[in-house]
Amino acid sequence: MRPVIKVGLSTASVYPLRAEAAFEYAAKLGYDGVELMVWGESVSQDIDAVKGLSRRYRVPVLSVHAPCLLISQRVWGANPVPKLERSVRAAEQLGAQTVVVHPPFRWQRRYAEGFSDQVAELEAASDVMIAVENMFPFRADRFFGADQSRERMRKRGGGPGPAISVFAPSFDPLAGNHAHYTLDLSHTATAGSDSLEMVRRMGSGLVHLHLCDGSGLPADEHLVPGRGTQPTAAVCQLLAGADFAGHVVLEVSTSSVRSATERETMLTESLQFARTYLLR
């Protein structure tokens, strides 16, 4: 019998609250663990402090998201090469299975040139998997407003249209020929990618899912799954019916909520969606 797929909560899902709130919500609502987003918050950078939160709330850390966002370029130093290695060491210390990382930015030339080799070397020396995440380009239609942007994507049948990628070699991680991948369903919406086709292309290399949604806006939305246009249920069912042995992490935006009750409702709805469609 295939094991139950574990469902985690990203600490980014409670922003602007701190990481501790994610552990608290995960424990209260019944998530199987958390994904640690390493960014500006000091606790997220302090692995001993994170260990303490994990013990206090009895919630394990399933994965670590490396500090590779634009807003976290100076976290753990400015050089992305040692930052990726440090992320793997953090995952080892926390007992996490996976490190999530974005493809390099184009201006990070030395990092980009050695990225595939570094990922392979780090994986060869550790039990931690480094799952490179699909991203999205900077779309020209972001200047036309939300409704026009969605309509333009609908008319062209998907795809980003005129756009510029800031990632090397591509916002599509499969261009890097890595062993392991993260699929983010908000990013597929923004990129106009076919999520189900990407699942098939990633194949057994798909070891981590960021479960969320998007409506096709040029901005990254991270909606509650089922509230956008992505085939979120179908993707979950496809993984549940396959030999997927990774984790599914809810990475949804709750930053616009007006109350703690509204945030809890969104996180509860997200977990219920995952449990329903990942059932084996």
Swiss-Prot record:
Keywords, comma-separated and alphabetical: Signal
Signal peptide coordinates: 1-21
Family matches, as InterPro entries: IolE/XylAMocC-like (IPR050312), Xyl_isomerase-like_sf (IPR036237), Xyl_isomerase-like_TIM-brl (IPR013022)
SUPFAM superfamilies cross-referenced by the UniProt entry: Xylose isomerase-like (SSF51658)
Family: To M.tuberculosis Rv0498 and S.coelicolor SCO3347.
Name of the protein in question: Uncharacterized protein ML2432
Organism in which the protein naturally occurs: Mycobacterium leprae (strain TN)
